[in-house]
Amino acid sequence: MDRWTRGATISLACGMLLALSSAPAFIVPPADPGTAKGVAAGMIFAGGAVEIAAGLFGIHRERGRTDVVLGLLSVATASILAFAGAIGAMGFLFLLGAWLLARGAIELMGGLAAETLAAVAAARLIRGWMDILVGLVALIGSLAAAFPLLLLSWPGTIVRSALLFVAASLLASAGLHIWLAAWFGRPGRSPRG
């Protein structure tokens, strides 16, 4: 198996694992913010570990630094979520919004710094803007929660939307890796052409 086929296989596996790590957002009903924190921390940690692996061993090793940095950011965020004491629904959503904004900024920088294959750069730019948009929605939602009369059942709404924000980010990352696998898995394709 040549380098590109092996890299495409790894990228496909990473994409599928990222998609699977988003499943708890759709399956687990958040009973309380504590349970949702644990679920989100697990999802983010799993996604971060997969992104680190994709950056180190995937098809686009030359630009894998971006994936490694995103993975490290995700692992750090998951650690904060898992080991932070009492963090309420508003703080939970604020932390996830900040995480998404940071991911979006890193994706944008990675897309702008890409030297080869404009399609990968474009995919990173699109994903970066998506993370920034979702992060802004999360931050605005956490600020709106300061006015509890606006949202009568805001803790449950915030917790559910926070899990969906994490799932959206993981699915976007999965899409990028699956697309890379499909593109480079064909004979004669390489990141240089």
Residue ranges and their predicted role:
Residues 1-14:
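N-terminal membrane topogenic signal
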Residues 27, 144-158:
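Membrane-interface helix termini and inter-helical loops of multi-pass transporters
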Residues 49-60, 108-116, 178-182:
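C-terminal ends of transmembrane helices
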Residues 81-127:
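Membrane-proximal helix-loop-helix units in multi-pass membrane proteins
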